[in-house]
């Protein structure tokens, strides 16, 4: 299965990832994800450098969740609050969360629908965001050179090297009453 096939099932996309992507995340991987977003889709992105900046360039009409707006307070906590709001925007639209962490998952971090358990100072906003998205039941795709902890219940995508998926099944196959 290719990215385009997966992305066609969604109309809202959230992108997240490392502030320092060079050397770990190949530019062609980021580009292929950007090119897979169907035209007219809603795209939500954070305000950081690195992966956020790349997708802001690709999608000039994206909704940018910016800490500088003051909407989420100030200091480090504002970045977590901003990320939580961004993830909830994707969750509310049954969208797809796409993550590009540039490090291994911090020990002890697991998916949870409680933001305080995900954003608990373990050291990686990318992984914290992914843990919260999964905890909320958001469908997720991850490009990770480091893999995903087994306890997260992600599947490796065999046709896509270093890509992993977690699908909320009802997002892909709508249940029918008739």
Over which residues does each language-model region extend?
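Acidic/glycine-enriched connector segments
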Residues: 2-12, 17-162
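SAM-dependent methyltransferases
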Residues: 161-178
